Curated annotation (Swiss-Prot):
This is EMBRYO SURROUNDING FACTOR 1-like protein 10. Disulfide bonds join C39-C55, C44-C74, C53-C70, C56-C63. The gene is ESFL10. It comes from Arabidopsis thaliana (Mouse-ear cress). The keyword DNA repair does not apply. Keywords: Disulfide bond, Signal.
Length: 82
């Protein structure tokens, strides 16, 4: 009977691992979400090979090809803090 309890415990632990990873994935995705008040998605005039750029809301000439670059700079140079 003890081997049955051990097997059930092992199965229970195996099913807990994906739930733990799912919770961590939500936290990491929340950091990547674009704050609409911080960065704006606009058509690129500077980069002809890329259709969309991401520009800081308060600094229209500060544009990036990816969301991550925009959010990292726009967080530091927030127009409300200037």
């Amino acid at each position: 009977m003890s081997s049955l309890y051990f097997a059930i415990l092992c199965l229970f632990m195996i099913f807990l691992v994906p739930l733990h990873e799912f919770g961590n994935a939500q936290g990491s995705e929340a950091e990547l979400q674009l704050d609409p008040s911080m960065c704006l998605r606009v058509e690129c005039a500077k980069h002809r090979n890329q259709k969309w750029c991401f520009c800081c809301a308060g600094l229209p000439r500060t544009c990036f090809l990816d969301k991550r670059g925009c959010t990292s700079v726009c967080k530091r140079e927030s127009p409300s803090m200037a």
